[in-house]
Amino acid sequence: MEAFHTHTGIGVPLRRSNVDTDQIIPAVYLKRVTRTGFEDGLFASWRSDPSFVLNLSPFDRGSVLVAGPDFGTGSSREHAVWALMDYGFRVVISSRFGDIFRGNAGKAGLLAAEVSQDGVELLWKLIEQSPGLEITANLQDRNITAGTTVLPFKIDDHTAWRLLEGLDDIALTLRKLDRIESYEATYPDWKPRTSPVA
C-alpha cells in the first residue's frame, strides 16, 4: 500500500446522506476475484442519471469526495473502498462513517476524514461556488484546506499511523517476519506448520 501524507484534488459534492455500501457498489459488481476493476460499479444506479455529480465536469475528474452523514454504512464489503479508489478517489470527507467502511478504508489506503457536519456543508458551498476547487487533505496535520478555509478532521491514531507508513494488513504482518520464523523454527515437527515465505 502506498503511504498517504497529503493529497490535493478536485472536490466532489455528494449531497446525499445514509449512503450504504450497496449504493456505493451494487452486489452485481462483486463477482470479480481481483481487487481492481470496480470503478464501473461505483454509484452505478445513480450514474445512469446524466445530472449525477460524477457525470458533470469537472467533478468527473475529482479525487476528494465530500459526502453527507453516515457514508459507507451497511454490509462490510471491501469492494466499496476498492470501487472508490479504482475510480480515482483518495479522500472521502463526511461527518460520520460506517465503522466497517472506515476500517476498510484505512486498510486499503483511502483516507476517511471525519469533519463536523457544518464543515461538510461549508465545503459543499465552496465547491458549488467554484467548481473545480481543489481540496487538500493533510494527514500529518489532520486538516482539510479548501481555498482559505482550513478544517480539522478526526481519525484514530492507529489508522493514521498505518496510512502514513503505508502499511496494509500484510505489511503489518511482514514487519514481524523474524519473530514468526523464529517461532516456526522451534515449533514441534508433529504439529501443523506454515510454509516459509519465498
Swiss-Prot record:
One of its GO terms (cellular component) is 3-isopropylmalate dehydratase complex. Pathway: Amino-acid biosynthesis; L-leucine biosynthesis; L-leucine from 3-methyl-2-oxobutanoate: step 2/4. Keywords: Amino-acid biosynthesis, Branched-chain amino acid biosynthesis, Leucine biosynthesis, Lyase. Belongs to the LeuD family. LeuD type 1 subfamily. Catalyzes the isomerization between 2-isopropylmalate and 3-isopropylmalate, via the formation of 2-isopropylmaleate. PANTHER family: 3-ISOPROPYLMALATE DEHYDRATASE SMALL SUBUNIT (PTHR43345:SF5), 3-ISOPROPYLMALATE DEHYDRATASE SMALL SUBUNIT 2-RELATED-RELATED (PTHR43345). This is 3-isopropylmalate dehydratase small subunit.
